[in-house]
C-alpha cells in the first residue's frame, strides 16, 4: 500500500479525525473527501446513504489508488462499513461513539450521547450502549442543527452562545457528568459546548481512538517510511461534491490542503 489515506465525511466534521491521524502519522499523503451535496447525513434514508457513499468512495479509491479508507462520520459508519469492506481490498476504518470510555469515566454513571438523529436511532448504537454502558443511565440527544452550526463555524461565521443554548438546554438540565460527542462535526464546537455545559461535564469523542487504529494498520502494512521528513504530510488533497465558499476554502488552505476540487461522482 503506497497511496494516500482517504478520509471521508459528509462535511468538514471529519477534519477533526484527520487532525488526530496526522498527529500520529505526519508523513503520509492524505485525501479528504466530503459529500457536502447531501449534508446532513442524519436526515437521509438508509439505502440512499449506503448507495451514495459506496459509489463515491469506491470511485475515489480507484481514482487515487488509496491505501486505506477512514469513514470519519458516525452516521455513515453505522451503515456503510460492511458494504465497503466487501467492495474494497484495502482496510476500512469507521468511527464508533465513545460510549465505552464514557461509561468508565462517569462518576455518576449518568452519561449522554449527542449525535445525529440517524446515529441515535440505529440498532448498532443501542447495542453499544447495552454492551458497554449497561450500568449507566444513558440520555440520547439527536441534532442535525448542530451539524449545520459546525459547518457555519468552519466557514468562518460567528456562532452565538444563544444558538448553542437553544439546542443543548435539555442536556444542561439533565444532570449528566459525561457527554459523548457522537458526530465528528461536534468537536468543531467543543469550546462552545463546554462553555455552555460547564466544566462539570466531561466531553469525549473518538478522534484519538480512530487515529490509533489507523496508525496500527499503516505500520502493520509497513507503509510508514521513517526516513521521510517529519512534521508535515507530503500531499493534502480535498475533494467535495458541491461547490464550497471562500470561507471553507480558506479553512482547507489553513489546514494544509494544497489542492481542492470537485470529486468525480460518476
Curated annotation (Swiss-Prot):
Residues reported in the UniProt entry to bind substrate: 9-10, 41-42, 74-75, 184-185
Active-site residues from the entry: 73, 183
Coiled-coil residues: none
Catalysis: reaction(s): L-glutamate = D-glutamate
Keywords of the record: Cell shape, Cell wall biogenesis/degradation, Isomerase, Peptidoglycan synthesis
InterPro entries found in the cross-reference section: Asp/Glu/hydantoin_racemase, Asp/Glu_race, Asp/Glu_racemase_AS_1, Asp/Glu_racemase_AS_2, Glu_race
Pathway: Cell wall biogenesis; peptidoglycan biosynthesis
Membrane-spanning parts: none
One GO MF term: glutamate racemase activity
E.C. designation(s): 5.1.1.3
SUPFAM superfamilies: Aspartate/glutamate racemase
PROSITE patterns xref list: ASP_GLU_RACEMASE_1 (PS00923), ASP_GLU_RACEMASE_2 (PS00924)
Protein's GO biological process: cell wall organization; peptidoglycan biosynthetic process; regulation of cell shape
Source species, domain of life: Bacteria
Tagged with keyword Repressor: no
Function: Provides the (R)-glutamate required for cell wall biosynthesis.
Family listed: Belongs to the aspartate/glutamate racemases family.
Name by which UniProt lists this protein: Glutamate racemase
Naturally occurring in which organism (per UniProt): Shewanella woodyi (strain ATCC 51908 / MS32)
Gene, per the UniProt record: murI
Amino acid at each position: 500500500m503506497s497511496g494516500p489515506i482517504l478520509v471521508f465525511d459528509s462535511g468538514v466534521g471529519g477534519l477533526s479525525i484527520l487532525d488526530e491521524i496526522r498527529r500520529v502519522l505526519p508523513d503520509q499523503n492524505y485525501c479528504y473527501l466530503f459529500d457536502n451535496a447531501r449534508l446532513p447525513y442524519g436526515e437521509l434514508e438508509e439505502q440512499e446513504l449506503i448507495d451514495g457513499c459506496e459509489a463515491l468512495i469506491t470511485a475515489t479509491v480507484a481514482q487515487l489508488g488509496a491505501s486505506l479508507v477512514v469513514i470519519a462520520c458516525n452516521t455513515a459508519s453505522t451503515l456503510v462499513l460492511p458494504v465497503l469492506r466487501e467492495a474494497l481490498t484495502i482496510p476500512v476504518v469507521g468511527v464508533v461513539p465513545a460510549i465505552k470510555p464514557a461509561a468508565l469515566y462517569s462518576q455518576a454513571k449518568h452519561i449522554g450521547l449527542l449525535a445525529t438523529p440517524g446515529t441515535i436511532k440505529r440498532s448498532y448504537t443501542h447495542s453499544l450502549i447495552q454492551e458497554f454502558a449497561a450500568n449507566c443511565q444513558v440520555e440520547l440527544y439527536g441534532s442535525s442543527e448542530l451539524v449545520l452550526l459546525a459547518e457555519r463555524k468552519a466557514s468562518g461565521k460567528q456562532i452565538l452562545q444563544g444558538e448553542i443554548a437553544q439546542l443543548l438546554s435539555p442536556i444542561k438540565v439533565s444532570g449528566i457528568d459525561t457527554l459523548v460527542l457522537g458526530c465528528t462535526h461536534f468537536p468543531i464546537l467543543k469550546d462552545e459546548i463546554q462553555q455552555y455545559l460547564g466544566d462539570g461535564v466531561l466531553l469525549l469523542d473518538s478522534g484519538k481512538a480512530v487515529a490509533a487504529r489507523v496508525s496500527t494498520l499503516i505500520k502493520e502494512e509497513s507503509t510508514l517510511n521513517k526516513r521521510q521528513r517529519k512534521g508535515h504530510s507530503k500531499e493534502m488533497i480535498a475533494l467535495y461534491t458541491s461547490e464550497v465558499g471562500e470561507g471553507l476554502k480558506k479553512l482547507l488552505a489553513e489546514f494544509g490542503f494544497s489542492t481542492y476540487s470537485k470529486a468525480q461522482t460518476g
